[in-house]
Amino acid sequence: TGVQTCALPILMEYYSSHINKLIEQLSHLPGIGAKSAQRLAFHIMNMPKDQVEQLTSSITGARENVQYCKCCCTLTDREICPICSNDKRDHSVIMVVENTRDLAAYEKTGKFDGVYHVLHGAISPMLGIGPDDIKLKELMQRLAKDEVKEVIIATNSSLEGETTAMYISKLIKPTGIKVSRIASGVPVGGDLEYIDEVTLLRALEGRVDL
């Protein structure tokens, strides 16, 4: 046809080196491709300076001050998160989730009064993520010292989530603690954070013993 399309890296040579660096860093974020990174970069360039300063300050502040809860490993700005420090919660029931976003999804239902344990990932041999790469050791240490009656495994219904659920079940069963899994009403491969509250509640209420 005689028409050549310019690849994105070629177009980027016309940008300022600072803009290129910004685009490159933004493209490392999950779900952000090269074109989306460009749009975000130029949006940031058009933002008022005080808004840019607030954005960078918020990022730095979150990164420097947010830590793992010493009890459940969720992300918090306290040593012990508000849920774990709440005496009105049922500390004998622990729901295991993959990340803090999943914890938030179940909290929005307003129906779970137990506590959580956040793994910060799932076992994935394909990606080289093993049991030692997520917060499993912390979970087992917690079960050894706390009086826990039930562990509800609420990992995602992806292959990684199911693999993790089975692994956790095998670890916990010898302790005599009841282990259950949220019901299969959650779509296969679905991330809990994107599922509506009614579906999450039904999955919790319909949980099955492992």
Where are these regions (language model features)?
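Conserved, well-folded catalytic cores of nucleic-acid-processing
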Residues: 25, 29, 47, 62-65, ...
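Cys/His-rich Zn2+-binding cysteine-cluster or related metal-binding knuckle/ribbon modules and their
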Residues: 13-19, 28, 38-103
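Conserved phosphate/pyrophosphate-binding and hydrolysis machinery centered on Walker-type P-loop NTPases
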Residues: 30, 49, 62, 74, ...
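Short, small-residue-biased leader/transition segments that mark boundaries at the very start
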Residues: 1-8
